[in-house]
Amino acid sequence: MLKPFVFITKPIPEEIEAFIGEHCRYEVWQEDTLPSDVLFEKLKEAEGLLTSGTSGPSINRELLEHAPKLKVVSNQSVGYDNFDIEAMKERGVVGTHTPYTLDDTVADLAFSLILSSARRVAELDRFVRAGKWGTVEEEALFGIDVHHQTLGIIGMGRIGEQAARRAKFGFDMEVLYHNRHRKQETEDSIGVKYAELDTLLEQSDFILLITPLTDETYHMIGEREFKLMKNSAIFVNISRGKTVDEKALIRALQEGWIRGAGLDVYEKEPVTQDNPLLQLDNVTLLPHIGSATAKVRFNMCKQAAENMLAAIQGQTPKNLTREFQ
């Protein structure tokens, strides 16, 4: 009997290719750009699609119309804002993602942005490379402390909890959090305190945004919210770029509403060279690499492959997104 066919939108480790090949016929797209017409042609026979929630195609009605046999879209990412949930349900296509494997790694990155922004690591690296060491008074290079300060976390999911542990037990910080639902068990085990969003913004020295992108969270941090923050605050976003009004963030940095920012995500990715953020010294910029370690990316890819194969074989994948559970 002919094995089912699956399409993979970007290169994956050879070991995982071999694993998929034991159960399916497959094709891996090797180029940087995947034209829509090519994708649609590949999907004519595909029962599974392995892709990414950050760099993969939008799973919308147009795509699904070209994929009559599709059973599952497996994201190699935690986020799945590329899913049109309603359209997928209408077609009987389930969606999966890869939570759990990256929680600690992304929390580590969050703290690297907090520390880098507080101590101006990227800015002062450029300062030294430009031969400016010794040209200004030392006070001009001062940063701010992280330990014993207040961290406000917006979105107390698994990554938020790991970030809170680092803050509380590693840096002896006061930790406030805001979440859709209060989490008493987390409050008891870690010692964090729930706060309304405005209170968190007003009282925190560092603000960490780790919320999924939904209709409700689109531009949830804008001019009003930045003006509520301390002018000494540092804002860090590792969620999705569109949770923040980027124009308001740029003004906040330019006009001193806040001290600085650390960003791993942006409204438009990759960032274009005319983005004003690139001209600002008080922001640390990363290229959306929250989970980017070799071990974690391998584990995410393996989990995505297992999710896809389970759905194709008529089993319930371990990591269905909540809308398909």
From Swiss-Prot:
Keywords, alphabetical: Gluconate utilization, NADP, Oxidoreductase
Any GO molecular function: NAD binding
Record carries keyword tRNA processing: no
Enzyme category, top tier: oxidoreductase
Top-level lineage group: Bacteria
Catalytic activity: D-gluconate + NADP(+) = 2-dehydro-D-gluconate + NADPH + H(+)
GO biological process: D-gluconate metabolic process
Residues at the catalytic site: 240, 269, 288 (proton donor)
Annotated protein name in UniProt: Probable 2-ketogluconate reductase
Source organism per UniProt: Bacillus subtilis (strain 168)
